[in-house]
Design a protein with these regions (language model features):
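Extreme N-terminal, non-catalytic leader segments
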Residues: 1-26
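Walker A (P-loop) phosphate-binding loop of P-loop NTPases
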Residues: 32
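Conserved nucleotide-sensing/catalytic segment adjacent to the nucleotide-binding pocket
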Residues: 64-113
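Hydrophobic positions on the alpha1 helix immediately C-terminal to the Walker A/P-loop
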Residues: 38
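Short beta-strand-centered segment that lines the nucleotide-binding/catalytic pocket of NTP-utilizing
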Residues: 50-67
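Conserved lysine of the Walker
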Residues: 35
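ATP-dependent NMP and nucleoside kinases share a basic, alpha-helical "lid"
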Residues: 113-171
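Small-molecule kinase domains that catalyze NTP-dependent phosphoryl transfer to phosphate-bearing small molecules
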Residues: 119, 145, 170-212
């Protein structure tokens, strides 16, 4: 397992992947680890080097809808592993790896309203690199463990718990939660999920270290 804190190192490894076929790069990490920002930055830099060669598939686009979560009595746990359509996510990866459709339209997650939006991001057949980002990509338990077969490169974003908690707190402040609501989110959802990820993720190809 390689360790780095430089984005240029990640780009170099991606560029050194075998030239043939489409490449799926997984960027995993705890809530608020910065994985989405890293995925977006990697995508932007790669597209600067070669236009439209990269795109992003966010795991959060496969959140179950709030209506379904409420009907099942698990809305308060939104973000936990069992609140995602994992098999739908795996099927989407299978389609993208097959690369036999001119275009695959994928869902995204609108963080401003905490809702997944279907049919939002078209990925052309010509796109070579798809950066998949999400919390549970490397989890070694079924059904999440089925995803690993689709990844050509896996990256885990490693951030100290104290920094994660600070970022998460700020996130929920920006969403208008009061102190009681923030404490519940942190103690019942985000921090337990982060601990679960740390304890149950398979070894990545690269650990990206962020200490600030």
């Amino acid at each position: 397992m390689q360790k780095t804190s430089e984005l240029d190192d990640l780009i170099k490894v991606i560029q050194e992947l075998p030239a043939s076929g489409r490449k799926i790069i997984a960027v995993a990490g705890a809530p608020a680890s910065g994985k989405s920002t890293i995925a977006e930055t990697l995508c932007d830099k790669m597209n600067e080097m070669k236009p439209e060669c990269a795109n992003i598939l966010p795991m959060d686009g496969f959140h179950y809808d709030d209506v379904l979560l409420k009907a099942r009595g698990i809305h308060s746990l939104k973000g936990a592993p069992h609140t995602f359509d994992v098999l739908g996510f795996a099927h989407m990866l299978k389609r993208l790896v097959a690369r036999n459709e001119d275009e695959v339209v994928t869902p995204v997650f609108d963080r401003s309203i905490e809702i997944a939006r279907a049919g939002s991001n078209p990925i052309s057949k010509d796109v070579k690199y798809i950066i998949v980002e999400g919390n549970y990509l490397l989890i070694n338990q079924h059904p999440w463990s089925e995803l690993k077969a689709y990844f050509d490169l896996s990256i885990f974003v490693d951030v100290p718990v104290a920094i994660l908690e600070e970022r998460l707190r700020q996130r929920w402040v920006e969403h208008g939660l009061d102190e009681k609501g923030i404490a519940r989110k942190l103690q019942e959802v985000d921090l337990p999920n982060g601990a679960f990820i740390a304890a149950n993720s398979s070894t990545p190809d690269i650990t990206f270290e962020m200490n600030s």
